[in-house]
Amino acid sequence: GPALLGLYYTSHILGHGEAVGKSSNCAHAVRCVKREFVEKRGLAPEQVMLTVCDADTYFDTQFMDCLAYTHVQNPKPYNTTYQAAETFFPNIWAVPILIRIKAIIDSVGFVGQLASPFSHPFPFAIYSQSLRTSMECGGWDVDIIPEDWHHYLKCWFKKDGDFGVVPVFMVMGNDAI
């Protein structure tokens, strides 16, 4: 059968005690994914990859292939968050010069941090991990706003420090604002 079952998204209505933001949205999405793909369709959590992104995220056409390849080649695929090489270039010529300069500096910095053997990168804005990893670490918290670092640290502590970011060197990103 096909290697990629499909791309899916969820729509989340804020519940009691939930903060507005990506973390509560991610928690909702994981509940939906577990219900639809694990409980109804019988897939194992190891067979499902989650990607967190923003509404203005653009993906390289080969990103999913590269992510899948990186995941299956990883000796510790369930102790990993995958981070793409994020840039802020889609609308770079439509923003004022100062924002353009900051977007270029940030883009170079993010890619450089991923490539550096001396850094310990944290996930930022657009990242992926297996459903199994999310379930083992307790998923995203609904009352947190900075979901990327919080969820990463939650996984890092749950796995006793045996958790890291693996770069996916496919360019993707968001609009510069």
Protein language model regions, located:
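Short aromatic/hydrophobic "clamp" motif used to bind/position activated sugar donors
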Residues: 50
